[in-house]
Amino acid sequence: WEASGHVSGFSDPLVECEKCKKRFRADQLDGAKKCPECGGGFGEVRQFNMMFATHVGAAEDEASVSYLRPETAGGIFVNFKNIVDSFHPKLPFGVAQIGKAFRNEIAPRDFIFRSREFEQMEVEYFVRETDWKRAFGEWKDGMNAFIGAVGIDAASVHELEVPDEERAHYSRRTVDFEFDYPFGRKELYGLAYRTDFDLSAHAKASGVEL
């Protein structure tokens, strides 16, 4: 997680009410200057890393620090060489998986929509760098088609082009598909072009060409 940039960059902006001490994600307050719970003022915005840290083994020192995975994609990248050496796939190809992920959310809410432990499905699709725009468009169209195929009302789904300053540290372009939930418009799923960031970072950290 250090190599992937999650230790230093997987964070959300946090503010704390100076009166009731409740904490909120600053980017979800819609510009509010007062606490929605008690009307108190907020302290300074600070970055809050969402990874759960723990220690492996009997000693609690820096060498034993470990993290619960905040996304499932990391396992695909660190096993990329094994996949290529075993199956010899030709570009483009994809790897899909489902599994548990854990995030130390600032404010879990809305039943199971935002929780600290959840099941996540991800697909990593590998293409040549010169072909990413075409592939991105195809996946975006396919994700829209999937929405209709499973019976979701297309009028309730909206595409959000995530601006540069709000994208994840690994992404060159991100489109979020947002759904009109009873509690507001929130992300349903997303599409991101991660470039070769992950493979290059893990290759550099491990000294193994992926």
Model-derived features with residue positions:
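TRNA-recognition modules of translation machinery and tRNA-sensing kinases, especially anticodon-binding
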Residues: 1-210
